[in-house]
A protein has these predicted regions:
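Positively charged, low-complexity intrinsically disordered leader regions
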Residues: 1-54, 58
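Adenosine-phosphate binding glycine-rich loop
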Residues: 257-258, 263-308
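Cys/His-enriched microdomains
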Residues: 320-323, 328, 352-355
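Cys/His-rich microdomains that often coordinate metals
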Residues: 329-334, 361
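Rossmann-like adenosine-cofactor binding region
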Residues: 197-274, 279
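Phosphate/diphosphate ligand-binding glycine-rich loop within oxidoreductases
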Residues: 34-141, 268-271
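Short linker/helix segments within small regulatory modules
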Residues: 338-352
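Glycine-rich phosphate/diphosphate-binding loop of Rossmann-like nucleotide-binding domains
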Residues: 46-59, 142-223, 351-360
């Protein structure tokens, strides 16, 4: 059963197909309002969400389907100690497709091992958020008409910013893409993202501490909030919160056709005065998310012709039950019954990573 955990679980051709379907839905929504009749989507949201959960629900309802689910760990049996595996085994009998969000990294990987229906990662901690990236890509497609030859600034929380990690992964497929990474040292991009997606694909990138310095270079600015819920030290959060604020003055430094994106919610990192700037596209971005999720649901339920096939990725070697991950945000640490599995691409037994959270074993 196919699951979408990482944006790279979809090939570039499949993403192009989803964009074409999403554009057709936007142009002719009446064609699609019965295609998921008698189908049920389960939204398993163990972490708060506004846009992603409502977007998935609106997507399924607009396709003529039905929705069941919950919107917090305190409203399901997780609060009683039920494991992800058991939750998924139960929901298998109730739904045709699952969208799952969880605060722990790698939780959807565990879920995918137990699901009998297609499962979509709707965000796992500070790890990945592939369907937000689909929304980002449709917005970029509408605004720029291409994914090639773009300079993209990523600003704010790059360490825990799952949307940033997924967007970088997606852009490895395209030509002459450059990233400008704008963050404080404490919130710089995780090493696995640098190694796998930037260095691993040969993408150009530079690290920068100043938003003002970066602005004139950018075709796209992707702002993110500093995520209070990811910090274990409140004093560190208070020190870093508000370090980058996009306002009219900074917008005056940007190209006339630059595009500002944000996965939302925002706190104080984009001044409301920017909302009226025609380059601000973050609310359009949320609208795009619904249509890309509609297209993805249809694809996973076999309602779109399989004219484009997934790419065959290099298979790693797996190491079972030898190591334990030490990442406190990893699902394998939080649920001790989750089997320890590490992966390596080194035949000589070199560096290996947890399959759930991508943390490298030192």
């Amino acid at each position: 059963m196919r699951s979408i955990i990482n944006i790279l679980d979809l090939s570039a051709g499949e993403i192009d197909q989803l964009i074409a379907v999403a554009d057709d839905i936007m142009a002719q929504p009446e064609k699609y309002n019965e295609v998921c009749r008698h189908k049920i989507l389960a939204t398993l949201f163990f972490e708060p969400s506004t846009r992603t959960r409502l977007s998935f629900e609106s997507a399924m309802l607009s396709l003529g389907g039905q929705v069941i689910g919950f919107s917090g760990a305190d409203s399901c049996s997780a609060v009683k100690g039920e494991t992800i595996a058991d939750t998924i085994e139960v929901v298998n009998g109730y739904a045709d497709i699952i969208a799952m969000r969880h605060p722990k990294e790698g939780a959807p990987v565990v879920a995918s091992m137990h699901t009998a229906v297609p499962l979509i990662n709707a965000g796992d901690g500070g790890h990945f958020h592939p369907t937000q990236t689909l929304a980002d890509l449709l917005t970029i497609h509408h605004e720029k008409g291409t994914f090639d030859n773009l300079t993209i600034g990523l600003c704010g929380d790059l360490k825990y910013g799952r949307t940033v990690h997924s967007l970088i992964a997606a852009m490895t497929r395209y030509k002459n893409v450059k990233f400008v990474l704008i963050s404080p040292e404490e919130l710089r991009l995780p090493q696995f993202v640098i190694d796998d997606y930037l260095e691993g694909s040969g993408l150009q990138y530079e690290e920068c501490r100043s938003l003002e310095e970066a602005m004139p270079k950018l075709d796209i600015l992707y702002m993110t909030r500093i995520q209070h819920e990811r910090f274990t030290d409140d004093a560190e959060y208070q020190r870093l919160n508000g370090i980058y604020v996009l306002d009219k003055e900074k917008m005056s430094l940007a190209k006339s056709d630059m595009c500002v994106l944000h996965p939302l919610p925002r706190v104080n990192e984009i001044s409301p005065e920017v909302d009226s700037d025609p380059r601000a596209k973050y609310f359009e971005q949320t609208r795009c998310g619904k249509f890309m999720r509609m297209a993805l649901i249809m694809k996973l339920l076999g309602l779109i012709p399989n004219e484009v096939q997934p790419e065959k990725a290099e298979e790693p070697q797996y190491i079972y039950d030898k190591y334990r991950c030490d990442n406190r945000a990893c699902i394998s640490v939080c649920e001790p019954d989750v089997r320890s599995i590490f992966k390596t691409f080194d035949a000589n037994g070199g560096a290996c990573r947890c399959i759930y959270c991508d943390k490298e074993r030192k």
